[in-house]
Structures are given as structure tokens and as C-alpha cells.
């Protein structure tokens, strides 16, 4: 039976019921709905709506229902209920009779679902924080293992300056730390309890909402009932935080896909996270990374969806808000599996050091060092930049690296060049010169790793 049937005389259309029912999606809020109902039983007992004995019986029945459904989750979806709240109430009435009909006193599905969803976001958010911290640890371990593996750094996907694989890992460590911070902040803002806000104007029973919030492990109650039942910022923020994190994961995936390609061959991926071709027997495809990259757009879509759903809703609750969950649930599922897969990819990754070093030695990645050398001899940087550009053009024509020019040849470009130029053009010198906070010099990388491990 619907929870709202008394007002209506005609039968609900079967098509409308199919369109309106949310149980196929919101069944995932079952545990939160039971936990919230247990807290609500205590709240209405505190204002004399039910006796202590009735409260005890309601809580026992709710806990029994929790155990039953955990043992057989299919009970929910085969119930025919409109939504998870209807399922819990109907199951409760089946257990304790008319006493079960008292539980909803002073409560609306509006504040009920708002509470359930915040509880769910808190629980899933904490699990996602743990996953992000796992990714952070894996990146840090890889950075420590490969801190001195030389590879080319890129701008515009053109070889730019030599860096190390450890430095690359630390870049994604920084991104992951921002993701962790963002999610923690979002969970802090979502840590308020809407229960007791009623449909929109507040419950008619003068209960202690601070105690109710504490019973559900929220930091405080919400402060405006209109906002409380219509607020979905926590959904938007979780989807937004996920979108930014997925963007970082997608960038990392793209880097690794390129590094793994035959054209680069800087890394090898384990068989655990790759697949083959149904036609070409030689193929080893980076499918885990490609799926991370692909699922990013799906997460973005859910963020745009909830923003669009909420953008023109008047206060307070509107049925449009029923559309808040499907996208959110998919975002959390997609983000979680992508974080798990990223950790698995990194744990089995091997750096092909000779190939990466060779690539770093090519592409005239030491050109900036030659310009800096000229500056050290007194030439203005802009002039030095122009001179080195001419040297590179000549080197390309001769198909040689800069360091293979004779001193006499180099002097034709700038007479101030001396024999001491050559030590400045080695890969080791290129790295060592970047000995500044955040730079790619090996001591800086080691210090950064040590500092992050010490936190």
C-alpha cells in the first residue's frame, strides 16, 4: 500500500507506478533507512509519542529486519514497494502490527530521504578516502622505487627536458593529495543532520535535534528546514570531487598508455591489467587504463545531470530530486573501481630504464642547459635562446646531438663557448641543475618522498 493513498479515490496507473517508483535505485539506502528509523524511534519516544516499551519493540523489529535483509537482499526488490521507505515501513508493520504505523509520526519522507542520503554519502565517502589514500601510498612507493629512472619530460607532447619517473609519480601524488583534501572537506560540509525538518517546515514535536544528530553520528543538526529537505549540495560536491579525481586518473592513464606504447616503450604493464586482440595475437592492450579514461566522461555526465536537475527547483522538495541517486550511485561505483584499478596497474608496472633514458637523451632536451651556460658567460637570456635555436637547427641538419659538435663548431655560434660547456650538456647535469624545491634533481625527489612518508 502506498504511504499517501488516503487522498486518492482512483487507482494509480500501472505505467505511472513504474515511472514513479524508485525502489530499483534507492534500495541501496536500506541500511541507512533502518538506522535513521531506529534513531527516530528514540526521538518520538523522548516526546511521548510512543512508550519506552513500544520504542524497544520497534527497534528490535528494525534490527531483525536489518539482519533478514542482509541475509537475503532480494527481499527488497521483490517486495513491490514504491521506495525504500515504503518497504521498511511495510515490513515493520508486518512484524509489529499497528505499532509500526506510529513510527512515521512527525517525520516526512522528505527529511527521511535527505538523512538517508547524507548517511550513505558519509559511509561511501570514508571508503573512498581510504581508496584515495591507497593510491597515494602506491604512487609514493613507485616514486621511491624509481626515483632516479631518467625519462623525457614533455610539453605539448614534445620532449622538453629530462625528468625522472619518480618526479612524474610525485606529480600525481600532489594531485591525489588535493583529491583527498577536497573529499574530506566535502564530507565535513555534509556532516549535518536533516532529520526533524519534516516535509519543509519542521516537525511539530519539540524533540532535541542535537541529540538526534548525535545519535546518527552527525556533527550537528541542520538549521533551516526549507533548506534541509531540498539541499543536495552533498550530492553535487561528491560528484564534483569525483569528477576532478577522475580527471587526474584519466591524465595518469593517458600518460601511462603513451609510456606503454611501442613508440615510447618506457614501461611495461602486467598481464593482470591488460588484454589481447581477438584477431592480432601479438597485441597486449592497456584496457584497464583505457577504461579509466573512458569512465571519466560517464562521471562528468552525472555531475552535469545533478546540476541540471537542481538548477531551477523552487523551495522546498520537488519530485525531480528523486533523480539525485542513480547518477550519484554510478559515480561512486565508477570512482571506486577506477581507484582500485589504478592501484593494481601501478603495483605491477615496470620501468624500462634503458629505453626511457635513451628517449631523454634525444630530442635536444639539453638545449635549455646550453642557453643557461651562455647566460652564465654573460649573454642575455633572450639572445642565448636565439643562439641555441640556431645550434639546434644545425644539429638537426647534421643529425647529431648538441654535445657531438666540436668546440670549433660551437664557437661559430657564440665565441664565448669554451671546453667547459660539455659537462653542462649531460643528462646528469640537466637533472642536477634543477636542485630547487619541487625540482627534478635527485636530492629534491628524495627529500619530497621522505617528507611525504613522514606525514
Curated annotation (Swiss-Prot):
Gene Ontology molecular function terms on file = argininosuccinate lyase activity
Q: In which pathway does it act?
A: Amino-acid biosynthesis; L-arginine biosynthesis; L-arginine from L-ornithine and carbamoyl phosphate: step 3/3
Tell me the compartments it is located in: Cytoplasm
GO BP annotations of the record are: arginine biosynthetic process via ornithine; L-arginine biosynthetic process
Catalysed reaction(s) here are:
2-(N(omega)-L-arginino)succinate = fumarate + L-arginine
The cross-references to SUPFAM superfamilies, in alphabetical order and at most eight, read:
L-aspartase-like
Q: Is DNA-binding set as a keyword in this record? A: no
Identify the EC number(s): 4.3.2.1
**Of which family is this protein a member?**
Belongs to the lyase 1 family. Argininosuccinate lyase subfamily.
State what protein this is by name. Answer: Argininosuccinate lyase
Source organism per entry reads Shewanella sp. (strain W3-18-1)
Record lineage = Bacteria, Pseudomonadati, Pseudomonadota, Gammaproteobacteria, Alteromonadales
